[in-house]
Amino acid sequence: MSFDHLQDLIKAKKNPTVAGLDPKPEYVPPHIRKASYDKYGETLEGAADAILQFNKGLMDALCDVVPAVKPQAAYYEKLGWQGMKAMDETIRYAREKGLFVIADIKRGDIGSTAQAYSDGWLG
């Protein structure tokens, strides 16, 4: 996707907002977390699934309003390969919904994001 496409989406939706997807399992509504934890246990896989399900709900609600989403890689990396799989599936779903995707994969970020990178790589 090109930035020309993003500009077209902004014009069509009359909205330049980008929805940030900076997921933390504890921010996912309890009923979504419970369903994922019932299926996978309170594991990285369960947390990653909860985040994916929450993201899908957000994108379903926002896809007619916002032109783009921005998943923050640190929060997915923190959950190991299961989190990266959730990020991949989030990106694929966003594209299916016609959303422009801006992957936030920078390093040297603000404190909370730097902490998430640290947790993901150093434990």
Question: What do these predicted ranges mean?
Answer:
Residues M1-G123:
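Active-site loop-to-helix "anion-binding N-cap" substructures in soluble metabolic enzymes
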